[in-house]
Amino acid sequence: MEFRHLGRSGLEVSLVGLGCNNFGMRCDFEQSKAVVHRALDLGITLFDTADVYGGGGRSEEFLGKILAGHREKVVIATKFGMKMGEGPHRMGGSRKYIMQAVEDSLRRLGTDYIDLYQIHRPDPHTPIEETLRALDDLVRQGKVRYIGHSNFAAWQATEAHFVAQRLNATPFISAQNEYNLLDRRIEAELVPACNAYG
């Protein structure tokens, strides 16, 4: 397996990562375990999940149990921001939600740190300054190693870059957007923005 640095960070990840969206929904625990063990056998060290995957965090729960004996050898990426229940502060990028969401993910994953913590989508109701300050606090506390974004447009990624610079806060190191042979829209603006600003 080849390894690459993620963005402009020192974090090395396997060239191929395993998406765990189906764990807890289409794949039960034993099926998920078989998939993860095969991935480990093939040299995959990057595992991507989210609090919302599997319905109510089951993907994180499955992944945490399966990787328990391999924690120091793998990179766990998870996301927050999608709706996780009824009532206020159950989604988005507010400080209040982020601080609760990270504790919930840490508990489900059975770990004391998350390698890569990503906002699942932009939050139009919360200033990016608030989101970045909260994430920076988590990095300083050691609960999160690196931060990233998912489903951001190029202008949002660029704005976040310059806001993090202005605040002297931890910057995003990753962008996780839909990209495949049929959907190559990110090549027009997001990829050049990430190449320019990290």
Regions found by a protein language model. Give the residues of each.
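Active-site mouth loops of central-metabolism enzymes
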Residues: 20-30, 84-99, 120-126
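Short, acidic/polar
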Residues: 27-39, 93-109, 157-162
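N-terminal binding-site loop/beta-alpha segment at the start of enzyme catalytic domains
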Residues: 1-75
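Generic structural signal for well-ordered alpha-helices
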Residues: 3, 36, 60, 64, ...
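Beta/alpha (TIM)-barrel catalytic core signal, keyed to glycine-rich beta->alpha loops juxtaposed to Asp/Glu
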Residues: 126-198
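Active-site beta-loop-alpha junctions enriched in small/polar residues
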Residues: 21-23, 50-52, 79-83, 119-122, ...
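Conserved, mostly hydrophobic/aromatic
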Residues: 6, 18, 32, 47, ...
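Short, well-ordered coil/turn segments that N-cap beta-strands
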Residues: 11-16, 43-46, 70-74, 110-115, ...
